[in-house]
Amino acid sequence: MVDLVYGRGITDIVREIPLYASIFKKFVGIKFFHTKPALYGSADIINVCNLHCSHCYWWLNRKDENQDLSVEDWRQTIRKTFKKQNLFVVTLVGGEPTMRPEIIEVFCQEMPRRVCVVTNGYFPLKRFEKLYFYWISLDGTEKAHNTIRGEGSYAKTKSNILEYIKGPPRNGKPAWKDIWITMTINTVNYSTALDLAEEWVGKVNKIGFQFHTPFMKGDPLWLEFGKLRNEMVDKLIDVRRKYPDFVINSEKQLSLMKRNWGGKGTTPIQCPSWAILSLDHMGRVKQPCCIGSADNKASKPICEDCGLGCYSVLVANGISGA
């Protein structure tokens, strides 16, 4: 199978022609009629995580709710939301989504090759036949990553990645193509971003960078706008030019990270938060975006300081406006 577009081969593209037609209609509506349809989805499939990372938004609003949706509950939710709205790709998050492999399997059954899993990679990576790919969170090189996620966590995740890519091809492609790395840049790890890219280029498929988004002013992890951040972005652009097939961010998207592109205060303005339908672990819609909460009284991300990759990529491609 030829790997044509972000891991999708000829067979995938032919099978998905009706879906592409639906997406095209959505883009026409957005551009010419100012409609606001959801394009992608995200789902917190579990309310538990094995780590307590210092920068993680999820713990801020987590409530001690032991109940999660069952397999069949999720199946019905998928059909009534993501599939009904013809969303192209759904990203599974948490908590730690790999702790509920049966739910990942349901998503893969319902939306084959259109499901990504964001994981800390602490547990062995299971091979799902119909998975799109894994996003593995690495917060810089080993020392910085361990500072954020706990001693020994980098070695554990690295070992699981390397073990996975030793495996046989999946869907006609080598296993390393299933692994994409995501790094959230903050004041602790920003100086290691380039080294992380150099460490993993040629070993995994892609790397994507985003910046820490604060929920409060004065957040010590937020790399504030200004000279240091601008220099960091310029270095990332250089890495993109050096490895255009490895760094997933475009130059335009990276350049957005030098300034406010999202909104005012906690209100989305330029950010197309409507473009991603985000559900929590009970299937409730999260507001104002994928790192928000279904609880209107919960803490909200500061849109004017946003560094999220999933929304900035849309703005960079001309989709904007709340």
Language-model regions, residue ranges each:
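Short, charged low-complexity linear segments at domain edges
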Residues: 19-38, 271-291
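Extracellular/secretory pathway and lumenal proteins
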Residues: 53, 60, 227, 275, ...
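Conserved residues at the C-terminal ends of beta-strands
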Residues: 59, 93, 137, 210, ...
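Membrane-interface junctions of multi-pass transporters
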Residues: 280, 284-322
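A structural signal for short, well-ordered beta-strand segments
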Residues: 41, 45, 134, 181, ...
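Radical SAM enzyme [4Fe-4S]-AdoMet core and its adjacent flexible, acidic
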Residues: 1-4, 12, 64, 132-285, ...
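Conserved alpha-helical substructure of the radical SAM core
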Residues: 2-130
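The −1 position to Zn-ligating cysteines in a subset of zinc-ribbon hairpins
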Residues: 48, 52, 270, 302-305
